[in-house]
Amino acid sequence: FVATLDNARTPTRLLLFSSERLPEDASVRGKTLERNRRRNAQLNQGVLLRDMAGEDYDPSRYCLPQEVSIVTEDGFRLPGLMTLPLDFDSTAVAKYPVHFEVYGGPDTPYVRDRWRTPGEAGRWFAENGIIHLVVDPRSAGHNGRAGEDMAYRQLTVWEIRDYVAWAGRVRSLPYVRADRIGVEGFSFGGTTTVMLLCQAPEYFRCGIAGGGVYDWTLYDTHYTERFMDTPQNNPEGYRVASVLEWAKDY
């Protein structure tokens, strides 16, 4: 059978495995036995068929992320991927601004330990001295139902708290400019972005929001009511989850 192997810092590899084994018993001996043993060892570890990296792959040429995480006050581990600037120096006098990339929808993790070919946007941040962070809240799926169930009938509530916890941790780092933290997201991430700007402007100074839902009573029912119940049964949940409720006092 064929399987793939990768992680956030390792390009995808295509490997061949086999459950069948060449004989290593008394029926074979000498060079045949040694050859069979070598072949079986290869099949145990996987025979490399293709390597996305290529022979000239040099990880130092790319802006690769590192895994980071925080633990909330109530015990949820929240994972993230942080990409540092190319000229990063944790001891430098000059500090770095931070760009958060968020989503926040239930059971939709953005942080995955898998290879993503570095794109132009990520490289732009790295070349321009900006720390780039992709982070997830408790409801993204990494904490199972214990985290996901907390989003039921109260979308955005715990997600916003978790992203604020992320920002609080990040701005405490000695090499971060606490007054230059921005956030960006699309779809549910657009909703999250505007909510963060309205509810936590002391943490997030600017944002770019696209395609968000700003009043859940106007969105499609098959998604909304799966997580929020109906507006008639959950009026308070819909009120709190509406960007308009928070934007009026912004």
Residue ranges of predicted features:
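Serine-hydrolase catalytic core recognition
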Residues: 2-250
